[in-house]
Amino acid sequence: MDKIKIVIIGGPTAGGKSEIAVRAAKLIGGEVISCDSMQIYKGMDIGTAKITTEEMQGVPHYMIDIADPKQEFSVYNFSEMAEKIIKDVSSRGKIPVIVGGTGLYVESLIYPLSFIAEKDDDVRARLYDEYERLGADHLYERLKQLDPDDAEKIHPNNVKRLLRALEIYEISGKTKTECAERVPNPAYDVGIFIINPPREELYAKIDARVEKMFSDGITDEVAGLLKNGTDWSNQSMQAIGYKEFRPYFENAVPLDGVKEAIKRNTRRYAKRQVTWFKRYSNAKWYGSSEKNKMLDDIKTFAERKNDE
């Protein structure tokens, strides 16, 4: 069976990924799957610089506006949904174009083994009952038999970690050590293309984007989320562009302080994103003046036979 060919477009925030993804999709007959952990949330448009309908230029986009801001959404939830979409897009003769800067989401598609075990309350409850009846020593001995490498890293009295390690095994049939191995997804033929503008240029784009967020009404957007019951403790409100507003709404800092904090945190995040994508040794990197070359390479990848 042929592997599903997927194009991954990554890079730092404000680097121009969304525009390139649309151009690439039109060039190769693709559809776009967003790989952004915050664009999944409805009503969080300005702070996430969510792509607009006009900017999509008629290209179908998935994994945007799929969750309520009060809802928790894990990398496991993402990979489960995204993999179904990838299969559907491919089954219609289209090429999935994965775009975004959330490294863990990208990783969950390329190396799925690491994310195989979601939490299971029933399994956890049974293991906890086992702990209460037989003690931590029993759990530790059991883990030593199953996964001696992981057992070495856990103190025999660290019940929380012992329970999680055994839970992973019972859910997935694989040890935590096996799940940690980065084994490429055998179902996909993956091309990774990274846009990485020079740092000064990127930082200027970040500053301009944050200024636009404020002129577009980000303060009102955050106020609306809070009014509708979203809480500062929600996962969605931990996002850069939102969490910085908490001291403002608590009358602790002025709006200018919020703006500067968002710029600073976004620059730091962009730096971490670039570091993350460097882990992919087979990725191709491009400067902001090399977009046409990037698109040419994506087209070449899309047209070649699998794993040539």
List where the protein language model places each region.
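Phosphate/pyrophosphate-binding catalytic cores of soluble transferases and nucleic-acid-acting enzymes
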Residues: M1-E308
